[in-house]
């Protein structure tokens, strides 16, 4: 007996995959930039009225947020690959991770704008659009057919 042919992957799923992957790459770049700049920024880059402990706190926060962006970028790229294959569980995980990332980055951009790098900030936009496209009815029907 021949195996049934799985349904053709819709274009909206491919577009969503590439958008999430683009956002993950931007998050990885922003995370690397944040981590390396936290370790290589000299004390003279800050105002003289800031204490050494305040400068240290800023640099630690920048490195921590950079590490979070790195881990999130790796997680999103893994989940996007599995989601592209039609696994419904990974699609849900990708969407929830995307929602958490968008909320986290925008709250941090409001409260601590010095800690978010521009690639990480711009990387949130394609991730949010891609996660939205994964939840559209055309792609949801394809995920249901794949199960």
Where are the regions that the model predicts?
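Topology signature of small-to-medium multi-pass alpha-helical membrane proteins
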Residues: 2-147
């Amino acid at each position: 007996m021949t195996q049934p042919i799985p349904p053709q992957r819709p274009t909206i799923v491919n577009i969503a995959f590439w958008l999430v992957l683009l956002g993950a790459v931007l998050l990885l770049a922003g995370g690397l930039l944040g981590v390396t700049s936290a370790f290589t920024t000299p004390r003279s880059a800050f105002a003289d009225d800031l204490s050494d402990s305040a400068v240290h706190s800023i640099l630690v926060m920048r490195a921590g947020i950079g590490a979070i962006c790195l881990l999130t970028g790796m997680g999103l790229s893994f989940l996007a690959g599995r989601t592209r294959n039609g696994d419904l569980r990974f699609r849900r995980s990708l969407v929830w991770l995307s929602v958490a990332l968008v909320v986290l980055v925008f709250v941090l951009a409001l409260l601590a704008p010095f800690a978010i790098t521009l690639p990480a900030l711009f990387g949130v936009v394609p991730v949010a659009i891609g996660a939205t496209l994964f939840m559209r009815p055309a792609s949801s029907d394809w995920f249901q057919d794949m199960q």
